[in-house]
Amino acid sequence: PEAIHQTLSQALNGNALREDFLKDAVIDFNQIQQIQIIACGNSNQKRMIAKYWFEQLIDLPCQVEIASEFRYRSPVIVDRTLYICISQSGETADTLAALRDTQKRAAAKHLMISTLTICNVATSSMVRETNHHLLTLAGPEIGVASTKAFTTQLTALMLLVLKIGQVKQTLADSVLAEIAADLWHLPKVILAALQKDTSILGLSELFVEKNHCLFLGRGTEFPIALEGALKLKEISYIHAEGYAAGELKHGPLALVDNDMPVVILAPKDDMLDKLKSNMEEVQARGGELFIFADENSGIQSQDRQHVVKIPSVSNWLAPIVYSVPVQLLSYHVAVLRGTDVDQPRNLAKSVTVE
């Protein structure tokens, strides 16, 4: 919560953007016609959420790319594009290489592009080599699996969306003020989610002997389903997959049986009724449900359906909040299984080689 508050403080003054926020950026946001986000690892989940925000909130097209694929497929470089690199360390090898390649190819074609890094390290290569940067004030993060860097970078992305929407006048002042107020409330909601720790520990005991797990979400919770699956496999070594819940009938449902835990992310939004239908499909096949549900969703615990109530939050900010319980679940499962939570096997905090 404190890291998020620090990140907000550099951008917001009350329910408005600070006048000096990104004021010194050598980027003309008004000229930007589309966004291209490049990232690796769990930053991929952040870019997917940001795509929803850029397109739904401020009507700005947004493409998202895995850096390790982007740099090798000779992508079309489009004029007046803002390329955003997301990296906790600012040294991720594939993301840095993709940035340099994009800059080189744009210069060769005399295209007007801009580059921006969202990063947690002020002295990093990406910060030095992009037109501007937005620092997340998360402080040191020792463990390989990103936690507070994940939530603060999502927060920074939302702040960037608000800034560009304000400059381009595609975001109403009233909407900006509403989201700003919700952002200030976010640390308190995150703290309340963290206080569900005991309940989540109870759920984790049911995962210890499992070998597989599914995570399901809709809308901006689909990337959080991917994040939950990534965290579980990273630190507990349980094979886990994240899916958009609407894709359940297109393959994942074949995996569901009475030994398959299925984690559901259920904020109270326009997709909730459809998500409940997906839950019924899992139950009909004998699957056991573990649901992180909005406290006002009406979803209750019952036989083979375990519910942890999550504090209500703005739909725009729900993915930031729902990342916390999936992180806690993965942490507790890993501890109970006796794995090294901070230094999981075969992985490094910063991937600086290909």
Predicted regions span which residues?
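Active-site phosphate/pyrophosphate-binding segments
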Residues: P1-Q36, A122, E129-P261, A334-E354
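Residue-level detector of functional hotspots within protein domains
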Residues: N15-F21, M48, Q56, E69, ...
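Glycine-rich phosphate-binding loops that contact phosphosugars or nucleotide phosphates
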Residues: N30-H185, R218, L265-V308, L329
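Active-site-adjacent beta-strand anchor residues
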Residues: A193, L265, P319
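Hydrophobic membrane-spanning alpha-helices of multi-pass integral membrane proteins
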Residues: M260-K268, Y322-S323, Q327
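Generic C-terminus detector
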Residues: S301-D303, K309, V313-E354
